[in-house]
Amino acid sequence: MKNINPTQTAAWQALQKHFDEMKDVTIADLFAKDGDRFSKFSATFDDQMLVDYSKNRITEETLAKLQDLAKECDLASAIKSMFSGEKINRTENRAVLHVALRNRSNTPILVDGKDVMPEVNAVLEKMKTFSEAIISGEWKGYTGKAITDVVNIGIGGSDLGPYMVTEALRPYKNHLNMHFVSNVDGTHIAEVLKKVNPETTLFLVASKTFTTQETMTNAHSARDWFLKAAGDEKHVAKHFAALSTNATAVGEFGIDTANMFEFWDWVGGRYSLWSAIGLSIVLSIGFDNFVELLSGAHAMDKHFSTTPAEKNLPVLLALIGIWYNNFFGAETEAILPYDQYMHRFAAYFQQGNMESNGKYVDRNGNVVDYQTGPIIWGEPGTNGQHAFYQLIHQGTKMVPCDFIAPAITHNPLSDHHQKLLSNFFAQTEALAFGKSREVVEQEYRDQGKDPATLDYVVPFKVFEGNRPTNSILLREITPFSLGALIALYEHKIFTQGVILNIFTFDQWGVELGKQLANRILPELKDDKEISSHDSSTNGLINRYKAWRG
């Protein structure tokens, strides 16, 4: 993978000149000039997903210049490097192979000359056997009762992905009740434990090292709660499993290492739902549906690795994102799923994108002089329409948006879905084309409004439009289509990282706060006044000590 400063390429200079020509061109102008714009700027994936990127401030020339940028930054070879097991995470000297976890073709993928697929398949088979025993009721708790509740204890990638997917695929869930605990705030574990019975609860402790502070604090509290009821420590083995690689620590905790599910250092946390970290998904929807999830992602992997860049959906979305972030100065992107089951999707890719590409140092170790990762946020529609869409429509910030919706709902109640989708279609139209002063004035005249009122109110009712959006229409949200959608975003993030010359798969930014917290924790044990920090931190700690009593 080559280290190329994108701003030093000829393509970047050409894009800067092109931006000067495009900055005042409106989306309405582009549609007026080209009646065939939708067919030129949309594509269908596997007859399961339609991606419409026509309501963007781009032309064919824009995309051609962005493709030139991808070529100059050698994106094609970077994609090959990732899929071939090259150690592209250089700061940690690791391969990046979440694609191997869902490699349903089972073609060999080598790391240090060793094919990883036999181990991947062995863990999958172990997950299958274990999950079937739990789901069928064959697995019994310490009093002989079957498991009814599963509590996944993890944080970051060990929580966000499994939680998002189990929520998104609730229509496929079985009888098991799923719970997720992540925050070290004792309230989180305490509230979940109020809902479950120690005789029928299985805890999954998800920590690669089995040392993650938040996860192990919660795991020990869960164990203490369990033992108050169960008494004998030998019963822990029937109610706890580990998603980890630290067999010694797992055994010391009381978990049978036969119920330890491993994954590898080439699996990044925020790309780990496809691995043993996804055991909670398997327990929720069953192994066959989990395989469908993997298959959907694998289909998108094949599309990404084999489709020319000009028709490659993750590449196109990545390039359009760079266009807005670096040339139009758009600092955020909103992900807006019009499906309540997808209510955690934006939060999942908030981590996926911001932890991956929130970097200010390039792959050469130099501070960048351009924009890297955007801020990601969003909520399900139509809730967001009654919350923050005001700013998207009439604010002073450009917020490119991804609108996502299924054509077929899992809950066909009355005309709910038609009303939902009418809003989905209307919002992108409104954002693109707006509402002119002339139209507003005519509406007021048609209503017989007082001319004085008209002059005062009209400016507030005008919508400039020209707000860019992508629309992603799924046939239906299934394990397969969700897998493909997640992989689409993963590869978009990777593509942007390659072009922006940053390391996408490390996350050193999370370390400093943890180090300082470990230093501060012993200082909170007693009531002594603290003076070892800056005046602000000292003041906060000392007031906390005074108030806690």
Swiss-Prot record:
SUPFAM superfamilies: SIS domain (SSF53697). Pathway: Carbohydrate biosynthesis; gluconeogenesis; Carbohydrate degradation; glycolysis; D-glyceraldehyde 3-phosphate and glycerone phosphate from D-glucose: step 2/4. One of its GO terms (cellular component) is cytosol. GO terms for molecular function: carbohydrate derivative binding; glucose-6-phosphate isomerase activity; monosaccharide binding. Its EC number is 5.3.1.9. This is Glucose-6-phosphate isomerase. It comes from Escherichia fergusonii (strain ATCC 35469 / DSM 13698 / CCUG 18766 / IAM 14443 / JCM 21226 / LMG 7866 / NBRC 102419 / NCTC 12128 / CDC 0568-73). Signal peptide: none annotated.
